[in-house]
Curated annotation (Swiss-Prot):
HAMAP family (UniProt xref): Rel_fac_2
Job of this protein: Peptide chain release factor 2 directs the termination of translation in response to the peptide chain termination codons UGA and UAA.
GO molecular function: translation release factor activity, codon specific
PROSITE patterns cross-referenced by the UniProt entry: RF_PROK_I
Protein family membership: Belongs to the prokaryotic/mitochondrial release factor family.
Residues with the N5-methylglutamine modification: 254
Organism: Variovorax paradoxus (strain S110)
Tagged with keyword Zinc-finger: no
GO cellular component: cytoplasm
UniProt protein name: Peptide chain release factor 2
Length: 367
């Protein structure tokens, strides 16, 4: 190992340390570490299992936090130790030690790249589970077979990622394959990883269903959307609510007109206004007004989610055969993404679920 190689190890460690520091800031390490301590304390409470749903939610949150906090702790510690060892090994001329440090640095960089990749998830729904709809297009039996190949491809991809899958719906083809299917994919960032797969996938091959061995072109559409949690917890930040009091009008005797017992609440972010003047005291009117505000915000959230779901459905109908995103030409051993121009020749690996090169390129280019 010459002097240039030795110096390069030091430069690599410095670069990795700087990237790790950037990740700590970007991923809000301090806040996540504090939240992880709170979640761990909650999970250690035996009473948490009295509410299995809450316990499961805490378990999922812990895993997500661990992925960031524990990884950053390991990176920070590993880089600090290796930097110290590097200076000692360099001074002592310990070539074996320097090689070991170089190997450790390569392993640490792999973890850093995974965290840096997570920075590309900028959609609020990215961390959620996903549904993958597969629909056979034009091409009859050949298209149905192609749809079944894609079903297998995404199941294999999910398996590679350690995701849990369930086929929610499957319609068999008349002769072979499937007319359509829906897969539920459960795991951290399942939607974020799969969302760029939405579009039309085109297959060109010599059909096994054509005795003459003719070349056939088939299509299938993929539509990926997030699983929206049905539970809606309305949390109102008091700072977002303006409270006004005024003298009530109407029935209630003389008392109701002599004091500012009526209460009006304005939820500033949404513009929703509620008021109550039925009670004889400001305290009771305030309680009722807050209950009404929560109800209004619940309704507002439900309507917003319905609108978002409708947008998803509308975008689904827009996926026509002209919206091709990827071409699989098996005869020529070529699969090409038409948006990123990424092209691979290992067609069987892709059909076996090795989609990382396509998905990463799509996320990096903001497809």
């Amino acid at each position: 190992m010459d002097a240039e190689q030795i110096n390069q190890i030091g430069a690599t460690l410095a670069d990795l340390s700087a990237r790790t520091a950037d990740l700590r800031r970007y991923l809000d390490y301090d806040a996540k570490a504090e939240r992880l301590r709170t979640v761990n304390a909650s999970l250690e409470d035996p009473n948490v299992w009295n509410d299995p749903k809450k316990a499961q939610e805490l378990g999922r949150e812990k895993k997500s936090l661990d992925d960031v906090v524990v990884t950053l702790d390991r990176l920070t510690s590993g880089l600090s130790d290796n930097t110290e060892l590097y200076e000692m090994s360099k001074e002592d001329g310990d070539m074996d030690g320097l090689q070991s440090i170089a190997d450790d640095a390569a392993a640490l960089e792999t973890d850093i790249k995974q965290l840096e990749f997570r920075r590309m998830f900028n959609n609020p729904a990215d961390p959620l589970n996903a549904f993958v709809d597969i629909q056979a297009g034009a091409g009859g039996t050949e298209a149905c077979d192609w749809a079944s190949m894609l079903l297998r491809q995404y199941l294999k991809y999910a398996e590679r990622k350690g995701f849990k899958t369930q086929i929610e719906d499957e319609t068999p083809g008349d002769t072979a394959g499937i007319k359509g299917a829906t897969i539920k994919v459960e795991g951290d960032y399942a939607f974020g990883l799969l969302r760029t797969e939405t579009g039309v996938h085109r297959l060109v091959r010599k059909s096994p269903f054509d005795s003459s061995g003719g070349r056939h072109t088939s299509f299938a559409s993929i539509f990926v959307y997030p699983e929206i949690d049905d539970s809606i917890e309305i949390e109102i930040n008091p700072a977002d609510v303006r409270t006004d009091t005024f003298r009530a009008s109407g029935a209630g005797g003389q008392h109701i007109n002599k004091t500012d017992s009526a209460v009006r609440l304005t939820h500033i972010p949404t513009g929703i206004v509620v008021q109550c003047q039925d009670g004889r005291s400001q305290h009771s009117n305030r309680d009722v007004a807050w209950k009404r505000l929560r109800s209004r915000l619940y309704d507002h959230e439900m309507r917003k989610r319905q609108e978002e779901q409708q947008k998803l459905e509308d975008s689904k109908t827009d996926v026509g055969w002209g919206h091709q995103i990827r071409s699989y030409v098996l005869d020529n051993s070529r699969i090409k993404d038409l948006r990123t121009n990424v092209e691979v020749s290992a067609t069987q690996k892709v059909l076996d679920g090795d989609l990382d090169v396509f998905i990463e390129a799509s996320l990096k280019q903001g497809v």
